[in-house]
Amino acid sequence: MIIPRFIRRMFRSPYDGMRHFAAVEEGVLYRCGQPTPEQLDELISRLNLKTVISLRGRRRADDPDGWEEQEASVCRRRGVEFISIPFNHKNPPTREQVGQFLAVMRDAKRRPVLLHCRVGQQRTGVFCALFRVHIQNVSPEQALQEMDALGFDVRHRRHQRLLEAYRRFAADAQALQPSS
């Protein structure tokens, strides 16, 4: 059955065109690929975002259009905290980076949070799975299955360092607890 374009537009999600957008926990954590400045502005309004966390790197090649400055500018204008926690498949996240992310997620005043990388699957998937394990008390295996189902692809050779980092940090609950 072919649905006319004007009818499809009537039922379009406000997040159409945004890569891999999903609520990890409604009102707490949302995930996606790199939003445009317009999409980010819309998300801030619709979701009442308090913090945006980018997991993208700062290399010039990774930012040909100045996405980071545009994103930071939208956040500044809207009074939203912008945090950059850059890592990639060759250089997985450090304990400090994971701890920084989890500290934000434990602070109710800094939520809701939008978490993204370029595509919204690998880097974002690792941090969302760690959120599920350390904040929502989901088993590491269940979080890994969810991460894979949402596009991580645990079998892909390129993702093995990220997968090893996930397993290490998922098992290391003691080290990632907030300091008293």
Question: What function would you assign to each model-found segment?
Answer:
Residues 123:
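Glycine/aspartate-rich loop-and-adjacent alpha/beta segment that forms the canonical ThDP
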Residues 120:
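Substrate/cofactor-recognition hotspot
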Residues 117:
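Short cysteine clusters
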Residues 1-114, 126-180:
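Cys-dependent protein tyrosine phosphatase-like superfamily
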